[in-house]
Design a protein with these regions (language model features):
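Juxtamembrane helix-loop boundaries in multi-pass membrane proteins
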Residues: 22-48, 64, 68, 90-115, ...
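Aromatic-anchored, glycine/proline-accented short structural segments
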Residues: 194-253
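C-terminal functional regions that serve as terminal interaction/effector modules
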Residues: 79-81, 256-263, 282-340
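Structural signature of hydrophobic alpha-helical transmembrane segments
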Residues: 66-79, 126-140, 186-199, 247-258, ...
Length: 340
């Protein structure tokens, strides 16, 4: 049975909040969550997977370009809204920064910028380089802030930990994907190394929390899919850095593949979880393992990876369609989340 944890829900956004977003004189903007940027991570990941699929299957490139443009437009919109929140509701922002759950979601902002950098390359290399520089610097700053907060905190409990804690780590592993084109190779190795190191540590902490403590709140169940992202992205980044499909790269890929399989066999359990805004976190990890599988085919030319990559890409497309339709329906029915 799924239990509901009491406390602040970083991914809760009601339709009432949605209607108040654009009015800074009303308190609705005060509740606009930083975690809303996780939607942009999903769109950026989907666009990247779609572009890789267009390359492998010789498809027109218009689809991925449109999704990247949409992600860019939404990024400007959401960033503007959150900037207004910082100006008018600074204490609410500080509460998010101090909260053990919402703290990790601040890394979704530099991660989105890094994904836009990937989208801009190679057609707009200068723009991509600027995005990458801002995203990489922001990601390093957020990682240092988050880790420092964890070290010196006095109120966190094991129940506060869950897979969203991987988000700051995932951002560092993304840096080399296009960073190898914009900066000395040692910088990519730097981000990759400590990102991988802290992924291993956090994996143990999160599994301990899942196995031996109270079940996560229903709205946080989708975050289990975040566990797919670090090894899948680690595989992609390692190949970008080395250019070779080594045994270590294969190790990373198959860890990500196994975690994906482990979660897919629990489809019935996940299907019983009602739609929340947090359901968007399915999308980015699904995109990561899809890209990794297509890259695996590109390197090995083994037909299995081609077929698996195609299947995952189709499933990812259906997932994105479901997320969009469910979000629209939630707005029409006056709420994203169930009442507390």
């Amino acid at each position: 049975m799924v239990r509901r944890e009491k406390g602040y829900d970083p991914l809760r956004l009601t339709v009432r909040d949605h209607h108040r977003m654009n009015d800074t004189s009303k308190p609705g903007l005060k509740n606009f969550p930083i975690a809303f940027f996780s939607i942009l991570m999903g769109l950026g990941g989907f666009a990247t997977a779609l572009r890789k699929g267009e390359e492998i299957f010789s498809l027109p490139s218009g689809g991925s370009r449109l999704v990247f443009i949409l992600a860019g437009i939404l990024f400007v919109l959401l960033s503007s809204l959150y900037l207004i929140k910082i100006v008018h509701h600074r204490e609410a922002v500080m509460q998010e920064l101090r909260h053990p759950v919402t703290l990790s979601f601040f890394s979704t902002l530099p991660i989105t910028i890094l994904l836009l950098s990937i989208g801009a390359y190679p057609e707009f290399p200068l723009l991509s380089k600027w995005f990458w520089g801002v995203g990489a610097a922001g990601q390093l700053g957020m990682t240092l802030y988050v880790l420092t907060t964890w070290i010196h905190q006095t109120h966190f409990q094991i129940e506060h930990s869950h897979p969203s804690w991987f988000i700051p780590v995932v951002g560092n592993i993304i840096v080399p994907v296009v960073g190898v084109e914009h900066a000395p190779l040692e910088i990519s190795w730097f981000y990759f190394s400590f990102g991988l190191f802290f992924w291993i540590i956090l994996q143990a902490i999160v599994l301990n929390r899942i196995f031996f403590h109270q079940p996560m709140a229903e709205k946080l169940i989708p975050t289990l899919f975040i566990m797919v992202a670090p090894p899948a992205l680690g595989f992609i980044s390692y190949l970008k850095i080395t250019g070779e499909l080594t045994q270590f790269a294969q190790l990373l890929y198959y860890i990500g593949g196994f975690i994906t399989l482990l979660l897919l066999v629990q489809f019935r359990a996940f299907s019983r979880v009602k739609f929340f805004l947090s359901s968007w976190v399915y999308s980015f990890p699904a995109a990561a393992i899809t890209i990794a599988t297509l890259v695996m085919y590109d390197k090995t030319q083994v037909i299995f990876f081609r077929q698996a990559g195609l299947a995952l890409l189709l499933l990812l497309g259906l997932l994105m369609l479901w997320l969009v339709v469910s979000t629209v329906n939630a707005i029409r029915h006056h709420g994203f989340c169930l009442p507390e």
